[in-house]
Structure formats: structure tokens, C-alpha cells
């Protein structure tokens, strides 16, 4: 999944930062700021629309608070190593899309399948 994010950063069809790629998708203004018409745009709060973003773990509506600190620390270490050292880069052969094996998204047949890792299938543009 991290390799897909990094592949998208390098693809001009997507934002050119990791956070930009992860947060890509429609947003809506929070009720906390929407009620104030005179509030400047820079102070408004926007949230991803649930289940409408590119990466479901960003907009699933669940708390982002880590409850398993050991797993969270390991995930951070892997992400840092991946970004800094390039370890595992290319493992998805340039994939810009993926999905779990238990779903069948309508976009899947329009892309080239490049592989499977665990319970995820990876694709790239033709």
C-alpha cells in the first residue's frame, strides 16, 4: 500500500506529496465552522467525505488514535524506512491502484493487474 502511495506521488494525475495523495478526494466543511458566514477561508475546517476518498483508512470515520502502540510504532518505522531508504520500492511494479481480494471495484477491469500481495491485488494504468 505504501508503494502505491509513493507511485501516485510520482504520477502527474495525483497530488505530488504523500499527504496530498492520501487525503485526495472530496471534502465537506465541518458544522463547527459552516455556521459562521464571516469566518475567513483559512480558519474553516474541512473533513473528508466518508467512504469517498482514495484510501478508505483516511475517510472511514473511525478515530485515528492508535490503540496498539507496538503495531503503530512498527508501522511508523516501516514507513520511515520505505521513504528514506527506498526499501521495498517497486514491489508493486508501478501500481497506482489496489483493492482487497474480497471486493470487486468497477475500475479494476480498466487497469492492468500487476500482482497480488497477501489479500491485496495491485494494478497500474495501461
Positions of predicted regions on the chain:
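Bacterial extracytoplasmic/cell-wall-associated proteins, especially those involved in peptidoglycan
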Residues: 1-126
Amino acid at each position: 500500500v505504501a508503494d502505491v502511495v509513493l507511485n501516485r506521488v510520482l504520477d502527474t494525475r495525483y497530488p505530488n506529496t504523500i499527504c496530498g495523495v492520501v487525503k485526495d478526494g472530496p471534502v465537506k466543511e465541518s458544522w463547527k465552522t459552516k455556521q459562521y458566514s464571516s469566518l475567513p477561508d483559512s480558519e474553516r475546517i474541512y473533513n473528508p467525505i466518508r467512504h469517498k476518498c482514495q484510501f478508505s483508512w483516511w475517510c472511514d470515520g473511525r478515530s485515528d488514535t492508535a490503540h496498539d502502540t507496538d503495531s503503530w510504532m512498527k508501522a511508523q518505522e516501516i514507513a520511515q524506512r520505505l521513504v528514506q531508504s527506498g526499501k521495498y520500492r517497486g514491489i508493486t511494479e508501478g501500481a497506482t491502484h489496489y483493492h482487497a481480494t474480497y471486493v470487486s471495484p468497477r475500475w479494476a477491469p480498466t487497469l492492468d493487474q500487476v500482482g497480488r500481495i497477501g489479500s491485496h491485488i495491485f494494478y497500474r494504468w495501461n
